[in-house]
């Protein structure tokens, strides 16, 4: 059984600005959990759409009751694949993100669509959908509730991070100074581990956007 969640967001910046900020989001004070990001591939289609795939390494501390279901070396980090397509003619950007780590325990798939706000052409609206599933017998509901709560927290941080980067792009004084995204040891560990995950990301099944 899959738990579905949907929400909307609004950024008071143009669609073009948001698209630029999307590729410059990290680091920001609200993304301490993002350790690394790598572009796996990128191409421009005959219709001038930009298609990209990124591999993200994030910290992902599980609650104690979940840790026993995870390998010790994977209990504190996760690999995420992010596919995106930017359509300059339709003025839309669609992203699809899903985890390739811990997927047997819990799978979180997110789809976002960025488009011009119909009421104000200088603003950008975001439709965000998530599908959270787990097949752990007896713990499915608890794991899904945990995943949903963490997802909602992540959305809040994502929006604040966007606003921070957009403000910096537009010359505003940031409300907070840049925090360290991780300790050097965490970064070194993530850099070593991500090499193994790159192969998984490059062979992962391409998701559909419709």
Regions found by a protein language model. Name each.
Residues 1-63:
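Hydrophobic ligand-binding cavity/cleft-lining segments
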Residues 2-8, 69-76, 85-210:
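Terminal "cap-and-tail" regions of soluble proteins that handle hydrophobic small molecules
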Residues 19, 30, 34, 83, ...:
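Generic alpha-helical secondary structure signal
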Residues 35, 48-52, 78-82, 91, ...:
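A generic structural signal for short beta-strands and their flanking turns/coil linkers
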Residues 55-76, 80-83:
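Eukaryotic helix-linker segments that join adjacent hydrophobic helices
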């Amino acid at each position: 059984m899959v738990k579905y969640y949907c929400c909307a967001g609004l950024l008071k910046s143009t669609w073009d600005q948001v698209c630029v900020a999307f590729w410059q989001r990290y680091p920001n004070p609200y993304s301490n959990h993002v350790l690394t990001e790598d572009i796996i591939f990128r191409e421009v289609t005959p219709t001038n759409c930009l298609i990209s795939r990124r591999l993200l390494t994030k910290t992902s501390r599980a609650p104690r009751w979940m840790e026993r279901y995870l390998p010790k070396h994977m209990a504190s980090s996760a690999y995420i694949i992010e596919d995106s397509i930017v359509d300059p003619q339709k003025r839309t950007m669609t992203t699809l993100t899903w985890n390739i780590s811990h997927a047997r325990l819990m799978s979180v798939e997110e789809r976002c669509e960025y488009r011009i706000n119909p009421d104000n052409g200088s603003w950008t609206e975001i439709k965000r959908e998530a599908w959270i599933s787990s097949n752990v017998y007896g713990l499915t509901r608890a794991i899904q509730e945990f995943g949903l709560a963490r997802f909602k927290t992540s959305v809040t941080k994502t929006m604040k991070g966007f606003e921070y980067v957009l403000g910096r792009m537009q010359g505003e004084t940031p409300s907070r100074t840049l925090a360290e995204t991780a300790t050097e040891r965490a970064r070194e560990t993530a850099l070593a581990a991500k090499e193994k995950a790159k192969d998984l990301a490059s062979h992962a099944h391409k998701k559909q956007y419709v």
